[in-house]
Amino acid sequence: MNCMNCGAPLGRSMYCPSCGKNVQQQKKAEHLSNLYYNQGLEKAQIRDLSGAEDLLLRSLKFNKLNIPARNLLGLVYYEMGEAVSALSEWIISKNFQRKDNLASDYIERLQKEANKLDSINLSIKKFNEALRCCREGNEDVAVIQLKKIIQQNHRLIKAHHLLALIYIHQEKYEKARKILKKAIRIDRTNSTTLRYLKEVEEKTGTATNLDSRWTLRERRHAEAEESSTYQVDNEIIIQPPAFRESSA
């Protein structure tokens, strides 16, 4: 930890050994930032992405220079299908720390897949169009667009939510349930997903089994996603499939 006033390394004292500034508040803020980061890391490990996002944003509120927290937030956004938001966090991270920063690697790998990035960006634009169709009452058109969007960017959880919401409004509850079960595999404790599932269960009188009804193919797909990790400072966290490194 370095003094924010002069940049000198700090010891255990509440005062900077170089400039004499009281650094007690700085140390407290950085401690809280690291605490929220570690909690966010735990959430990310169990694919509670929305919970991880909330904690990582809190971490950055206390210390915007917390590079591991910002990089992990980018990974969480990527896992949620928000590649543009992920890239933004990594660019900010790189601007704060240009050397020895994993963000540089993430940016490079993402930019190498320009076609995929363009496809993701297009899917987000199409989502906004689908949302506009919903507001104008053109639900059938929105459904067609959202199905295509999910094919292009299967991690875009807000597209799953909007499609499920349309199905609920149209009283097509089993279709909504199917979409929401896919959403829960992206973000296991997402409050919107769980709220919509609860509504489906109330309307149908049937509970949703989120495990035993999975097909073998679905289970293998989920397990493959869970096994995708990377390591930094002896801690294991999720890694987007696009960023997997080949083993020797």
What are these regions (language model features)?
Residues Q24, L60-K61, I92-N95, K148-Q151, ...:
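Conserved structural position within tetratricopeptide repeats
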Residues Q45-I46, E79, F96, E113-K116, ...:
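Register position in tetratricopeptide repeats
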Residues A29-N34, I67-P68, N101-L102, S123, ...:
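Helix-start (N-cap) detector for alpha-helical repeat units in TPR-like alpha-solenoids
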Residues G20-A29:
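Short Cys/His-rich micro-motifs in 6-15 aa windows
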Residues N34-Q45, K112-Q151, I157-K158:
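Alpha-helical adaptor scaffolds
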